[in-house]
Amino acid sequence: VLSVCRAGDEIIVPRNVHKSVINALILCGATPVYLNTETDSKLGIVLGVTVKQVEQAIIAHPKAVAVLVNNPTYYGICSDIKGICDIAHSYGLKVLADEAHGTHLYFGDNLPINSMKAGADIAAISMHKSGGSLTQSSILLTNNGINADYVQTIINITQTTSASYLLMTSLDISRRNLALRGRQSFAKVTEWAQYAREEINSIGGYYAYGRELINGGSVYDYDVTKLCVYTRDIGLDGIEVYDILRD
């Protein structure tokens, strides 16, 4: 965010952005233009944003310099990030991707499109979530539309000068493992997740949702590796299930 926004700029973001995005806006002085996302009335989860929503926001806010997209959300919901990239670029805006939960999208043939392939200008990827590196370690990917030297300057300003070699080593080991075995590993993960989803749904009373949520708009695609189970039909909410499993 600090690499593309200045004080007085506007940036188009969905309502369910991570708090780190808000913190970055506070630091750089840019103003968020919020996109109101739909919520699934049964599951209670926030869905994605549509290309139409993004274009309407761009037209209404000529001071906007960038669009930020979650790809995917914590619950596996994906917006049409390629369509968003295409429309944003046609108006001269940069596209930033919060791909914290999408490391594996770069290593699966049957998974939603990753942000770099979709045309995003910059993407933050939390390798420690599904890539196997140590907690706190992540990587930042940039396309040709981003000044890499300026990004490095921002990193130097905001991060420690005493970087953890333990974290960096874990990133490199995980990078190598993904490069050599990522596709095979996530093919198995996808298979196991789908098997678990089918078994859970066969029990009755539970609902492990999947690609049936796709509607071409607010749910443009779905990350099947996210195994989420709805339990309200048996009278339990998530906190209660959490306590039962811990006990």
What are these regions (language model features)?
Residues C5-V21:
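Conserved PLP-anchoring active-site segment centered on the Schiff-base-forming lysine
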Residues D9, S90-L93, A120:
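A short helix->loop->beta-strand "cap" motif at the edges of active sites that frequently abuts
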Residues V13-P14, Y34-L35, L68-V69, V95-E99, ...:
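General beta-strand structural signal in soluble alpha/beta enzymes
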Residues L43-H104:
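Active-site phosphate-binding strand-loop segment of PLP-dependent enzymes
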Residues P112-T153, Q159-S170:
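Active-site PLP attachment segment
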Residues S174-R197:
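Structural signature of PLP-dependent enzymes
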Residues E191-D247:
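Conserved C-terminal alpha-helix-loop-beta "cap" of PLP-dependent enzymes
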